[in-house]
Design a protein with these regions (language model features):
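Bacterial N-terminal signal peptides that target proteins for export
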Residues: 1-9
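Bacterial N-terminal signal peptides
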Residues: 8-17
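Extracytoplasmic copper-binding redox domains, predominantly the cupredoxin/blue-copper superfamily
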Residues: 20-149
Length: 149
């Protein structure tokens, strides 16, 4: 009986540890990178439900914040502080578009796809509200979203 309980507890804790922990990813906030000026790297990140993303303030003057209307319904919004790392756990499947608030007009935006891009069409339609504010890199968000088709 003792042997059975020991094995049962071992299996329970093994199963619990697998379910509890998702992968961790890092996105850097940069003045200049592979995608040009004022970018997040990687610009488009695909993760699984339950994964965590650390938005790293690699260079000063940036933040990471979700954009209302450009994330799955019922998903938790986030607002990182200026010059601060912020860590976000993604529990809802779909496409999330986020910004660097002070550099939105420069199209400093990024995309996280959690699982399947179930809300892609809605994001494309709603993205017009944000792309009209860009003064440079006007096609950046459209090009990011085009990679998800």
């Amino acid at each position: 009986m003792k042997k059975f309980l020991t094995k049962a507890l071992f299996l329970f804790f093994c199963a619990f540890s697998v379910v509890s922990y998702g992968a961790e990813h890092t996105v850097k906030m940069l003045n200049s990178g592979q995608g040009g000026s004022m970018v997040f790297e990687p610009a488009v990140l695909k993760v699984n439900v339950g994964d965590t993303v650390k938005f790293e303030a690699s260079e000063p003057g940036h933040n990471s914040a979700s954009i209302p209307g450009l994330l799955p319904s019922d998903a938790k919004a986030w607002q990182g502080g200026l010059n601060q790392d912020v860590t976000v756990k993604f529990d809802k499947e779909g496409v999330y578009v986020y910004q660097c608030t002070p550099h939105l007009v420069l199209a400093m935006i990024g995309v996280v796809v959690v699982g399947d891009a179930t809300n892609l069409q809605e994001i494309k339609e709603n993205s017009k509200q944000i792309t009209s504010k860009f003064v440079m890199n006007k096609d950046r968000l459209d090009s990011y979203l085009a990679t998800l088709n």
